[in-house]
Structures are given as structure tokens and as C-alpha cells.
Amino acid sequence: MNSQQSYCHQDSLIRRGVIISVIVLIYICLPLSVLIGLIPWNMKFVTLIAGAIVAYLISRLLGYTNLDLGITLRRARPSLIAVAPFTLVFLVASILWLVLGGVRFKPTEDLGFFIFYIFISCPIQELLFRGVLSSLFNSFKMREYIEIIVASLLFGFVHIIYQDAITVVIMTIVGYFWYSAYKREPSLVGVTISHIILGVFTIVVGLVD
């Protein structure tokens, strides 16, 4: 191995180390900190926003563009088409669950929450768990099915803060389909719209908290 190859190898190792640190600290440690009370419950959304900002800035420093992170209107229509079947199926499944199993939670959210959820929370979650995560995973050259599974597990894991196993399982499954759709059409438009539709519906009818 010559000096140039050695430098490139070392640079790759450093890059992967930074990426692993970001994933561990933001995608694992932050939810755990909320769960065990190190971060107050009423600061969970502030924590989400701060984590997303840090992850975004580090991604840009690593050389990823907004296009790489899915922040683009290109392929917006195909991205909407990619999530449409799953969104429809999940809506129907949610209605069936509601009819057969009833309400799980009593909705307490006000208009201000839904404005925040639609315009800030959902877009930020999609940036963090689809756009940024997909770009970071590119450095590891994983098989796509493994990447999708890991990403969906991380998305499900963040919901441990609600201390509800059903929510974690559902979000892991939903995360699998959203990440798969994003890999097919790498624009955040489709997955964000799907997230808003499904999220608002399931919260309003009391299926998730």
C-alpha cells in the first residue's frame, strides 16, 4: 500500500468513525436519554430538532449535498406514487384496527401541536431517518435489505420514549416501508406527505399517542 492509498484508507476510517458516532449519539443515545429522564419529557421535540440540525450539518461537512439528503423537488411525483400503495393500505389497516380493537389512547393534542407536527416534526423526522441516514449508510456499502432493516429498527427505536411496545413495533414496520420507498425514489416529498397523513390520522383517532 503506497502513501496515497494509506491516506485514503485512514481518511475512510475516520469518516466511518464520525458516522458511527453520529448514529450512536443521535439515533440511540438521545432517545435513551429521554426514556430514562436525563432529558426532560417536555424537551423531546427540542431534542429531535437539535439532533436533526446536528446530523444535517455533519452530513454537509462530510460532503453530502441537499440533493443527496433528499431535499429536492426532483422526482417529487414519483416519490408520492412510491408511497401511495403503502399509505392507503396502512390507512385501511388503521381503520380496521379502530373498528375491531377500539381507541388505544384518548387524543389530547391541540391545533398548535398539529401545526408543529405537520410543518416541523414530520419533515424533520424524514430528513433525519430517511435523508440523512441513507446518505450516512452509503459509506458502509451495505446490502440494501440490511440497510433498510437497520434503518427501520432505528426509527422504531426512537419511539421507545413513549414506553409502548405496540407503537415501537408499528413504527418499525412503517419505517421499513418508508425507507424502502425513499430508496426507490430519493426525495423527501413522498415519505413526508405519507408521514403527515398517517401520523395525523392515527393520532386523531387515538391509535398512537
Range-by-range predicted roles:
Residues M1-N66, P78, I203-D209:
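N-terminal, membrane-interfacial amphipathic/helix-forming hydrophobic leader that caps
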Residues A76-P78, P107-L111, F140-I146, D164-A165, ...:
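Membrane-helix interface segments
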Residues S33-K44, Y64-C122, L127, S139:
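Juxtamembrane helix-loop-helix connectors linking adjacent transmembrane helices
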Residues F45-V54, L111-F116, I124, L128, ...:
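Membrane-embedded alpha-helical segments of multi-pass membrane proteins
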Residues L127-V150, S180-S187:
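Membrane-interface helix/loop boundary segments of multi-pass membrane proteins
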Residues T167-D209:
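Functionally important transmembrane alpha-helices
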Residues G17-S21, F45, S79-A84, I115, ...:
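Hydrophobic alpha-helical transmembrane segments
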Residues V24-S33, L88-W97, S152-I160, I197-L207:
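Aromatic-anchored segments of alpha-helical transmembrane domains
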